[in-house]
Amino acid sequence: YLGGHSDISAGAVISSKVRIDRVYELAKSLGGTLSEFSAWLLERSIKTLPIRVWQQNENAMGLANFLNSHSLISKVYYPGLISHEGHEIAKRQMKGFGGMLSIELHPSIKPELFLKNLKIIKPVMSLAGIESTANYPKLTSHYSLTDKERSLQAISDQLIRLSAGIESIIDLKNDIDNSLKWSENEN
């Protein structure tokens, strides 16, 4: 999120002095600073962080509401939805509900086809840039787990993770809707 362009990996450690000291010792051994170029990219990009995050929040909320009533979506996981079990906590703790959401595709939709049929939203490994992206945990982040291990972590074969970017919400809704319809027809 900090860079917004999927071109750097950076962050900060916010913790107690004891933990910071441990991280500092490890960083001395492994290297804990960005290259000059990465630091420049981060400094450049952080200026637009508030507007990017605001738009990502807006788009994620719009997608969650749209998908929550879509006949080809079995479930939407997004704390901005009143139906989400963590909604009240998120409402108290956060100014927005974030740019990430997860969806369970209807059993009639093959996840691979759904991803293939997307035109604007890109299937990728990393999330949280300015472009909207989708990720299929079964074949990416949770690939090495058995079906049982994935099930224990609530990672179903139909789960897709979406990272809302800053594109037009109308375009994003149309992209998902078209992909779902095309994917259903290809079965």
Task: Walk through the language-model features, giving the residues of each.
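Active-site C-terminal subdomain of aminotransferase-like
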Residues: Y1-M100, E104-T133, P137
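PLP-dependent enzyme catalytic core of the Aspartate aminotransferase-like
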Residues: I109, K116, S132-N187
